[in-house]
Amino acid sequence: MDSLSLLRIIFQKTHQRLLKDYTQHSSFSDLLESGAYDCVSGSAALGLLLDRYGYSYEVVETDYHVFIQVYLEGKTLILESTLPVGGMITAPSAVSGYLGAYLNEGKPVARNINEGLAGTKVDTSDNTIFRKVNLSELAGLQHYNEAIVHFNQQEYRQAIDLLSKALVLYPSERIEGLKDLSIDLAYHTYGVDIRK
């Protein structure tokens, strides 16, 4: 079996057996317990399998989304975990179009700090982030995503705790910025000083 065929089987079997129900802001624990996943947890599962089978790949973080680029026999392929059908993009023109949708003339453009990373339908017209991350940093993004849920529910202490965990795994401006904002809002909204 060639590498492309094996990759296709990995992608298909992962969706059949693990990635069962797309649910925005699902955790990796949710994925393992019930099959609920989002782009972060789905990409993490695929990344672990790609590691196991020796594929060369990179996880790409954008403002609202995470996906995987696989490098195979001199070509770049896309694994889009949120699309069980059509999510393995192999045609060079389709790969270029997919990547181009996240870039504006080669550079990303600005976004809101309290937006999540779990969407399937993403407006990419004003992206600012297009960054390669490793699996540890992806785990940090998982904590960030969970923190956004708490932030949007004005549960700032829980958001700050998750953002602190995220920063250990992935020190980034967006995580630090949301943590600072959560601390400020906890103080201004509830009069609680939660500096750590």
Predicted feature locations:
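TPR repeat positional signature
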Residues: H143, E176-K179
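Hydrophobic/aromatic-rich core segments of domains that either
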Residues: A44-E105
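TPR-adjacent "capping" and linker segments in tetratricopeptide-repeat scaffold/adaptor proteins
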Residues: S93, L99-G106, I113-Q142
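Hydrophobic/aromatic side-chain positions at a characteristic register within alpha-helices
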Residues: F151, L167-Y170
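Secondary-structure boundary elements
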Residues: M1-D30
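Alpha-helical linker/edge segments of TPR/alpha-solenoid repeat scaffolds
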Residues: I183-K196
